[in-house]
Every structure is written in structure tokens, then in C-alpha cells.
A protein has these predicted regions:
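Catalytic-domain carbohydrate-binding cleft regions of carbohydrate-active enzymes
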Residues: 1-274
Length: 274
């Protein structure tokens, strides 16, 4: 196997309303987006941000910050703000098949309206169970790879194939034991808010995480997904990743990409996935 390509993907996981009201969470969303925009402006943030598979985050933000529309459109056009494919993350068993299709159509349409190219990552990692037609529905939009977590066996196996009721297949990345929060908890220690940041410890934790993912992933492409429940970008840990990318350990190359770029690399090695 040639050098392992580590794909760092920056995201969040956003419930519009959960243990706080919609407006309380929107207040936090505005902060999150403002901090991202500032990071791109001052050069500390050097890659794309994935909007949790949804476009509604951007809609909610622009309702509160309409003056930011031109900046959002510029970021979308440049590929730094990656939206969709969903309008809003669905529950597959509470809505009809028609609703799922229209949800995807609306999300992709909005992403284009804001100047972006809608994500082709079938992002359904936090849904409590899946229906057998999802690969078929995704394929109708040219989406041939996705990301899951809940309800999937073999937590130490990252890549598998999902076959729909009609025989349509898609390649699936399965998040680890803690799901999309793996990196956030094991490297950023976001579940320990009082823990002081330590760059050296951050680098040690990062490489332990990467090497664990390498063991669980058959392809050269490895995913480091930085996104947890309502979490913002963390400039300190991001700086550690950038520093390590300049002189990575032997056998690894580190970059900041998107879910689309990661899945495209995985698809190229699809023959190794069963």
C-alpha cells in the first residue's frame, strides 16, 4: 500500500432544536458561522467547512445575518463552504419516500442558488435506522457513497457496501464507536471543557487517532472527521493538525479536504471494499 492519505474534514453536527430552543441554538449557530468567516478572513482556516449534510444551517444563519449573503456566496463558489445534499436532515421512518426525494432536491437547489456545488456525500450518520431504498434514492441524484453510524454492526470496520432493495449499491463509510464525535472526544476532548489545551498532547492524540483509523480502513484514504454536537471550529487543535501536516510521520500525507474529496478517493479503491 502506498502512502496513506489523511483527509481532515471540518464540520459540526447541528440539531436546530433539541435540549435548547431553536432560537437558542441559532444564537450558537451565528457564533459558529461568524467565527468560521473570521478564520477564513485572517488565514487561520485554510480549508473547507461541511454544513453537516444540510443547507438549512446557512438559511438559518442568513435570516439572522442577511448582510453576510455576498460573503457566503463567495465562500460557496470557492468551495470553502460545502452545503447539502439535504435541505434538512430527515428521519427516514417518519417521512415518505417522496419527502426524502424533495428534501434532497430542495437542498441541492438552495446550494446552487448560493453559488455552491451541492455535496455528493450521502450524509445520514445520525439517523436512528435506515430504509432499504436509500442507496436507490441517492443514486437518483448521482450520489454513490455515503456515511453512516447508528444501527451498523462491526464498529471496527470503516468501509462496506450497502445494497438497496432493488439491487442498487453504494459504498458506505461507517463511523467508529463514538460516531461522528470520535475525533472531537479523543483528540479535542470536547467532552472535557475545563481541560487545558496542550499542543504536544494534541499531536500525540492526533497520531494515535490516525493510526487507529488506518487499522480500521482498507483504503489509502483515511478520514479525520472534526464535527460533534453543536461544536465550533477549534483553532488550537486545527493549528496542531496543520503543523503535523508539514512534517507527517512516515507513510502518511495529511491534508484538509471535504467529504466529497474523501469519498471520491475511496470510490477509486472500491474493489477493495466488500
Amino acid at each position: 500500500m502506498s502512502s496513506r492519505q489523511v483527509h481532515y474534514v471540518l464540520s459540526t453536527h447541528w440539531d436546530r432544536e433539541w435540549y435548547q430552543s431553536f432560537q437558542n441554538f441559532r444564537y450558537r449557530l451565528v457564533q459558529l458561522m461568524d467565527h468560521l468567516l473570521q478564520g477564513w478572513q485572517d488565514g487561520r482556516l485554510q480549508g473547507p467547512f461541511q454544513t453537516d449534510g444540510q443547507t438549512i444551517l446557512v438559511e438559518d444563519y442568513l435570516e439572522a445575518r442577511p448582510e453576510k449573503r455576498a460573503e457566503i456566496e463567495s465562500l460557496a463558489k470557492s468551495g470553502r463552504l460545502v452545503m447539502g445534499p439535504w435541505y434538512v436532515m430527515p428521519d427516514e421512518f417518519l417521512v415518505s419516500g417522496e419527502s426524502l426525494v424533495r428534501n434532497l432536491r430542495m437542498g441541492r437547489s438552495l446550494a446552487r442558488q448560493w453559488g455552491g456545488r451541492p455535496s455528493q456525500a450521502g450524509f445520514i450518520c445520525d439517523i436512528f435506522g435506515h430504509n432499504s431504498q436509500m442507496p436507490q434514492i441517492f443514486a437518483g441524484f448521482g450520489i454513490h457513497a455515503g456515511l453512516l453510524w447508528r444501527g451498523i454492526n462491526q464498529p471496527d470496520k470503516r468501509l462496506l457496501r450497502w445494497r438497496a432493495a432493488d439491487g442498487t449499491e453504494m459504498i458506505v463509510y461507517r463511523f467508529g464507536q463514538i460516531g461522528y464525535c470520535d475525533y472531537a472526544f479523543k483528540v479535542r476532548h470536547a467532552d472535557q471543557p475545563k481541560r487545558a489545551f496542550d499542543a504536544e498532547a494534541g499531536a500525540t492524540d492526533l497520531w494515535a487517532f490516525i493510526e487507529n483509523e488506518a487499522k480500521a480502513t482498507k483504503t489509502n484514504a483515511i478520514l479525520v472527521f472534526d464535527g460533534g454536537d453543536h461544536l465550533e471550529w477549534n483553532p488550537d487543535h486545527y493549528a496542531v493538525y496543520l503543523e503535523q501536516s508539514k512534517a507527517p510521520r512516515a507513510g502518511y500525507t495529511l491534508s484538509h479536504t471535504s467529504l466529497d474529496e474523501f469519498l471520491a478517493a475511496v470510490i477509486k479503491e472500491g474493489k477493495s471494499i466488500s
